[in-house]
């Protein structure tokens, strides 16, 4: 690798501010705020609005829209019967 062209890659703590869920990962982002991790070391903290701990898709609280709405509308418009009936 060429020297001096790659960003500094280091461990950081990502903190979901909604649920206070924390995880340690590698990143090129940095922060002046630090926090002590479970291993006793201090790492920079990156605050997140949404993570896998609070996103509706991953938590199972997602609401699904009716997927067959367009098909039903087309069939109704052209007087076709639905296959479901």
Swiss-Prot record:
Gene Ontology CC terms: ribonucleoprotein complex; ribosome
One MF term in the entry's GO annotations: structural constituent of ribosome
Alphabetized SUPFAM superfamilies for the sequence: L28p-like
Keywords: Ribonucleoprotein, Ribosomal protein
GO biological process: translation
InterPro entries assigned: Ribosomal_bL28/bL31-like_sf, Ribosomal_bL31, Ribosomal_bL31_B, Ribosomal_bL31_sf
Superkingdom in the source lineage: Bacteria
Keyword Ribonucleoprotein: yes
Pfam families: Ribosomal_L31
UniProt family annotation: Belongs to the bacterial ribosomal protein bL31 family. Type B subfamily.
Quaternary structure (record): Part of the 50S ribosomal subunit.
Name of the molecule in the record: Large ribosomal subunit protein bL31B
Classification lineage: Bacteria, Bacillati, Bacillota, Bacilli, Bacillales
């Amino acid at each position: 690798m060429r020297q001096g062209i790659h960003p500094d890659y280091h461990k950081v703590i990502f903190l979901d501010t909604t649920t206070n869920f924390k995880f340690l990962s590698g990143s090129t982002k940095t922060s002046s705020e630090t926090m002590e991790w479970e291993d006793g070391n201090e790492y920079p903290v990156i605050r997140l609005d949404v993570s896998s701990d609070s996103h509706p898709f991953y938590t199972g609280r997602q609401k699904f829209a009716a997927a067959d709405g367009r098909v039903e509308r087309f069939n109704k418009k052209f007087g076709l019967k639905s296959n479901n009936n």
